[in-house]
Amino acid sequence: QRQMCIRDRVIFGEYNPPTFDMKDSEKWVDMSVAYLKYLVCDLGFTCIKYFNIFNEPDGDWASTNGDYLLWKKMLFLFHKKISEYPMLAKQVKLAAPDVVMDYHNSNSEYDAEGWLMQTIADADDIIGVYDLHAYPGQAEVRSGSYSKLLASYKNHIPSDKQIILGEAGYKYWRTADSLLMAEYNRRLVNHPYTKGTDCNMLCYDYFYGLDMPLLAMEVMNAGYSGLAMWMLDDAMHSNGDSGKPEDIKIWGMWNILGEEVFNSPKEEELRPSFYTWSLMCRYFPSGADILKTEVLDGNNEIYAVAGMYKGKLTVAIVNIGKEDKKINLSLPKEMTSALLYVYEEEHLNKDENGFPLPVQTGMKLNSYSNTIKSNSFIILTDLSDE
């Protein structure tokens, strides 16, 4: 089982049934919902708001193997069972379909977008939130073209529903990312604790701390309501859930068992992406309104997102170019006691735990001008840390 936390709202769900031959078993449904009820109604985990029945059911790696009709049948069985417990049904709604964007299993009649559209047609009245997974390439996102794909999916969503990315990260199999893929493969050779089956070996790199907030900006500006970075901690997931330490999935912001299990204390250190991702999560909290932003000179190396939360403003900007960029920022309101955080490869202001510290505090601003270094990221906010 797995969960995705959106501040005080948790998506809880099944990865697959205990055995693949239980994929259409009502016994599995009964067991699963009984445990969900135990968590929510008996133990009081009221933070659980959504439930997902299969991980990536369109995948050829899933027990469903792209069988939409089987998945739909089970979706309605789970809904029926949840409905038998009024308190649970009031608290928890279904998240679906959890399919992988830009993917088509040859065994399935639908690609991911078609699966989403069919889910809306068949089951919108029982869906609480629409949920997708996304693993674009670096060139795709940095070129700005990924926003078109995001918009295509978002345009199908009914106006009274939200859409989120329940998993998001980067994969480098596309031709435009061939140099990154070559480096990925080089790092796998004789690696002591992964075979590279499902990893991002570049999650250790400084640039990943630019690419993840950039992806978040594109998702936020496309009208999505949240995304979860895959993943938090390398120690949480091995290939096939085997528990074997020689083949873990390396995607995280650290590995909490680096010393104890993997004989590498360095793996426990916070990776660069933690710096920027923690800031995005802190200053664009659940309930923030995302504002329309525009880069007036059409510069395709500067990306920005802005949000308002309880009257406080946050602006995040990333420069993915090779040159420093002068920016002049027009603000919709005065910022009082603003903080400035900067992510630069040679300038990462941190406390003793490695957590980000602002480089400026107490700023009072009606506008903002500065030079953003090449390959860097900033957050400007007057939202309190308290």
Predicted regions and their residues:
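Aromatic/acidic polysaccharide-binding cleft in carbohydrate-active enzymes
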Residues: 170-303
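C-terminal beta-strand-rich structural cap/linker in extracellular carbohydrate-active enzymes
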Residues: 356-386
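Active-site cleft segment of glycoside hydrolase catalytic domains centered on the general acid/base Glu
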Residues: 17-128, 133-152, 176-180, 210
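Structural recognition of the beta-strand scaffold that forms the well-ordered cores
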Residues: 9-13, 49-53, 93-96, 128-132, ...
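C-terminal accessory region downstream of the catalytic core in glycan-modifying enzymes
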Residues: 329-362
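Carbohydrate-binding surface patches
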Residues: 296-334, 343-345, 375-379
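Short, small-residue-biased leader/transition segments that mark boundaries at the very start
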Residues: 1-6
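Glycoside hydrolase catalytic-domain groove-lining segments
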Residues: 128, 135-195, 215
